[in-house]
A protein has these predicted regions:
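Class I SAM-dependent methyltransferase SAM/SAH-binding core
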Residues: 34, 40-87
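A short SAM/SAH-binding and catalytic strip from SAM-dependent methyltransferases
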Residues: 98-111
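A C-terminal cap/extension of S-adenosyl-L-methionine-dependent methyltransferases
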Residues: 181-257
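Conserved class I S-adenosyl-L-methionine
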Residues: 1-28, 128-150
Length: 257
């Protein structure tokens, strides 16, 4: 736990979701941030290092303890809150400028979770999430094989799930990541003969960022071009980042993607 390099994990070229989210949020110093489903706390501590006032929420006391230790190792503090995403149990008056949920929604009831989280977003605030999508055949083969490193409650997001955001938020922006860059995972399996049941590839690719950088970076540029020219390819990406906001005047403004 203490060996986690929080900045490296979140700033790696092979962590495009967090790099985009950090740019999207801008200067977060002094902002109130809720990390829902914080896990070991890598994102919570990173946001705290960037100056945010962080509350880390998880249904596991062990995870919250780990997040607290990681914060201490990095010289920052986070407030911990024990609760499930579908039942936040926060004080009704609790408000946050930023609500972050990383790799969470595909484990929970999305509609219920969004309905519980939304009241705690401050006026002018933003909720940002990222999760896997359901449609890429290569990833679906990986999912069928890597049963030992996945959980039974996982349900990668489909089009219907993405539409749920518009039920709860007036403004929705979506960005997509990992298309041709998925070649890295094929190399891991086919050329390097690595076992997806022994290693969590989504963690390995971040940990081995320097090793994959020369391949990843040009493929990422190719992805950007392809996703602009051929928008339907977006649903074949591995992950989607969704940023949502509630207008100061309810029920105004058009949804956009």
């Amino acid at each position: 736990m203490e060996n986690i390099d929080v900045r490296a994990v979140n700033e790696a070229c092979t962590a495009p979701e967090m790099r985009y989210i950090t740019r999207r949020l801008g200067n977060i110093r002094g902002k109130r941030l809720l990390d829902v489903g914080c896990g070991l706390g890598e994102a919570s501590v990173y946001f705290a290092l960037l100056g945010a006032d962080v509350t880390s929420c998880d249904l596991s006391r062990g995870m919250l303890d780990a997040a607290g230790r990681l914060a201490g190792t990095n010289g920052v503090k986070v407030t911990t809150h024990l609760a499930a995403a579908e039942d936040m149990r926060l004080p009704p008056e609790a408000r946050f400028d930023i609500i972050y949920a990383g790799n969470l929604l595909h484990h929970v009831d999305i509609d219920r979770t969004l309905s519980r989280i939304k009241p705690h977003l401050a006026p002018g605030g933003v909720m940002v999430t990222w999760d896997p999508l359901a449609y890429n055949p290569v990833i679906n083969i990986y999912r069928a094989i890597a049963t030992d490193v996945r959980t039974p409650d996982e349900h990668p997001l489909g089009v219907g799930d993405l539409r749920l955001f518009r039920k709860h938020f007036a403004t929705v922006e979506t960005r997509y990541f990992w298309l041709t860059t998925l070649l890295i995972f094929l190399i891991m399996v086919l050329a390097q003969r690595r076992n997806p049941n022994k290693e969590r590839f989504w963690k390995v690719v971040v940990r081995e960022e320097r090793k994959w950088r020369r391949l990843y970076q040009p493929l990422e540029k190719l992805d950007r071009v392809l996703l602009v020219i051929f928008p339907p390819l977006r649903l074949l990406c591995w992950n989607a980042v969704v940023a949502c906001s509630i207008p100061l005047i309810p029920d105004t403004g058009a949804s956009q993607e």
